[in-house]
């Protein structure tokens, strides 16, 4: 099972690194704030994580509700990283809207994974994780 999880774990590490960069190290992107793409980026990060987990669970012979587990684990990870951002040493803050975006990204991945399953296809397109 661990072999199947390698891409999901790698992506989870990237997410953790991105979410826990100290606030003073973050670049100032004024255009980014204007477009408010932040929530889309958050949703996208956890969409990818949930899709990778669902594919890994499927390939590893996980229980029947593996898509639900992928959603729950990804959403919990997203909420946890937001709480960690609230640590004073990082100079950042937790944001409930980011928690919601993270969870919605994981939920959207679950819908996507179920749709791919019903079509009889791999969850991750193009055979990337076979």
What do these predicted ranges mean?
Residues 1-96, 103-130:
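Bulky hydrophobic segments
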């Amino acid at each position: 099972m661990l072999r199947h999880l390698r891409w999901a774990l790698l992506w989870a590490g990237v997410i953790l690194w991105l979410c826990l960069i100290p606030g003073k190290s973050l670049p100032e992107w004024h255009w980014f704030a204007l477009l408010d793409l932040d929530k889309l980026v958050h949703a996208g990060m956890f969409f990818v994580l949930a899709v990778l987990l669902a594919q890994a669970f499927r390939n590893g012979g996980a229980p029947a509700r593996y898509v639900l587990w992928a959603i729950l684990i990804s959403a919990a990870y997203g909420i946890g990283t937001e709480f960690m951002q609230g640590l004073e040493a990082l100079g950042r803050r937790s944001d409930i809207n980011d928690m919601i975006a993270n969870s919605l990204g994981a939920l959207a991945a679950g819908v996507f994974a179920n749709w791919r399953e019903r079509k009889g296809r791999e969850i991750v397109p193009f055979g990337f994780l076979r």
